[in-house]
Amino acid sequence: MKRISYASAKVRKTLLFGEGKLIEDYENLLTGRRYTSCGGNVVIGSTKFGSRKKLPFSDMEVFSADESGYTLRDDGFGITVRVDCDEAECGALREKLTVTAEEDVFVHSVCLGGMIIADSSFTWQAPLGKRVFVPSKIARFGQPVYVGDVFIGAETPVAENGIVKGTARSVYHTARKFSELAEDGDAYSPPAFIVGAAKESGFDAVSDAFLRYVSEMALSDSFRVQFNSWYDNMLDIDPEKIEKSFTAVGDGMKKAGFRPLDCYVVDDGWTEYDKPLFWEFNSKFADGFVKESRLTEKLGGKFGVWFGPRGGYTSQTPVYAGLLEKIGYHSNRYSRDICTADPKYVSDLTDRMAEFCEKFNVDYFKIDGFAICSCPSAGHGHPSALCNVKGFYVYLWEQWLKGFEKIRRVCPGVCLNVTSYAHCSPWFLKWADFIWMNNASDMGYVGEGDSLSRCLNYRDSRYRALFLDDERQFPAGNLYNHEPCYAKRNFDPKFSKSSPVVYTDGQFELYMYCCMMRGSGLAELYFSPEMMNDAKWNIAARVLEWAESRHGILKYSRFFGSDPAKGGAYGYLAVGDNGDRVTMLRNSSGEVSEYELTMPDGKKTSGTLAPFETVITETVGGQTREIIRAKS
C-alpha cells in the first residue's frame, strides 16, 4: 500500500491506500498520540437509485495524490472529491474539500472527519440544552468536539459537530441540488475541516487549546467603548434627542479624562415601518443620518446603526413584513415576521448596510433579530424547513456570512455585532466581531437583595448557564451582554415598573467593575446622561480605563461557583498569557457565606463573605492589590 502524509505544526494526517482500501489517521505531534479515522462521506439523492445514498470516502478510489492533497473518485455515481491540506491558526490542520458531480444530484449532507473514539479515554461534545431563543439542536451547531488531546470541527457556525456511533465527525447539512451549491457551476467547496492539538488529554487542556485557536482565528481582539441610544429613549428618538444624548455622553466622558469613544450608536426608531419601503428613514430623520454622522466625527468617534433583519420587535413587525411582501420580499408565516433566509432580502439588506458605511461614516452595526423559528415555505429561495430544518439554518447563515463579507469589502474595519436568534458558535468570529449571549433578556433582575444585587444575579446566572450548564466553548472577550446599563428605561419590576433603577455613586462603581469582570471586549454604554453626575462620569472613565488596560487578561474571564439566582458564593477568574490574573468573588445571598470553591485553573479558594459582598483583586507584574471591596 502507498503512504502519504500532510502536516501542520501540531497535527499530521497520514493516508494508506491501495488494493481498493483507504485508511486515514491523525497524529497529535505534541504528544505522539494517533487517532484512526473512517473518513468522511457525501450523502446524495438521485432518481437512479432512490432518495438517499451514502458514499463513504473510504470506499472511493484514490485517483491521485500530491504534496498538497489527494483526489478521491466514485465512478459508479460520478462523484469526485479533492482534499487539500494546509495549516490553520494555532498550528491546526485544515482540510479543504472540493466536490464535483457528473449529474445534478441532490446533496443531503457532507460529512467530514469520522475520527474513531474507541481508543480515547476522554471525549466531549456540547450538550443539548433546552430551547431559549433558538432550537437546542441548532444552539449546539458550530461547537467543537474534543477527543483525547485533539479538537475537531468545521470552519463554519452551522456544522453539526458531534459524536455518533463511536465516531467524531462534522456534518454540513447542504439540503440542495449540486447545481445550487456549485457557485461556479462546476465544483462545490463546503466549509473546511479543522483538527487541532493540545499538550495533554482532558477537558481543560483541550478547551484551552481550542480557545487559543479561536483567539488567532477571530477577527477581533479589541476593546471597544461606545454609547447606544436604546435604554435612554428606546423608539422615541429624533435628531434633537440623539444630538443631546450623544453630546452629553461625549462631554461627560471627555471631562472625566477618558479617551474619545469609539462609536455612538442609533438603535431602533429610525426606520419607516408604516409604508412598503425597504429600510428607509421615517419622517423624523428626513435627512438620513448626515447630521448624526458629522456629530460623531466631531466627538472623535465613528457612527453606529441598528438594523433588525426580522423587522424589529413591536406590534408593527408583522405589518412591516406584509408591506415588504408587496415589493418582492417574503415573510415567515410561522413567526409572522420577515423571512430572514430569503436570499434576495439578505443581499439587499447587506447592500443597504454597505451603503451606510459609505454615506454615514458607519463602522459598527448592531444586527438584531434573525430567525425566531425556521421558515416552512418552499418558494423563498431557501430549503423548506418542512423538509430539512437543519438545511434551512445552514442556508440562512450561508447567506448572512456572504453579506458580512460584502460589508467588509466596503468597510474593512467595520465592527459587526450579531445578536438575537444567532447562537454562540466561536466560528462566527471569522465573520463577526461579537455575538449576543442569546440566553438572556436585555436586562433582568432575579434573586435576593436590592436592585444592584438582583441585576448582578441575573446576568451572572445567565453566564453560568451558558458556560457551565450548556458548556458553550466561546471566548468571553467576544461575547456581547448588553451591559453596562444605567438609564431611565431600565426598571426592576420587583420595586417599580415605572421608575428607573438608581444607584449611589458607590453602587455604580461596584456595578461597573462587575460588568467588566465578565471580560467582554464590547463595552456598549446604555446610559441616560441626565442620571449621571460628575462622580459617576469619573467612575465610568476610571473603570473603563482599568478594563481596557487589563483586556489582555479579562478576555479570558471564566465563571465559577454557585448559581447567583439561587444565592451563594461565585466568581470570575481571568488569567492572562503571562500569568497575570484578576479574580472576583461575590456572595449573592443575604446570609454570611463560608465558601470553598474550585476555580477554573483547578486551585481552591476559601474564606468568608458578608451578605452581598463583592471582592475584586488583581495580581499584575507580581504585585497583588485589591481593586474593590463593597456590598451591593
Residue ranges and their predicted role:
Residues I4-Y6, V11, D25-A168, K604-V615:
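Polysaccharide-binding surfaces and accessory modules of carbohydrate-active proteins
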Residues V206, F210, P260-V266, D287-Y334, ...:
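Glycine-rich, aromatic-flanked loop segments that form ligand/cofactor-binding clefts
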Residues Q226-E243, T271-D287, S331-T350, P383-W397, ...:
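The substrate-binding groove and active-site-proximal loops of carbohydrate-active enzymes
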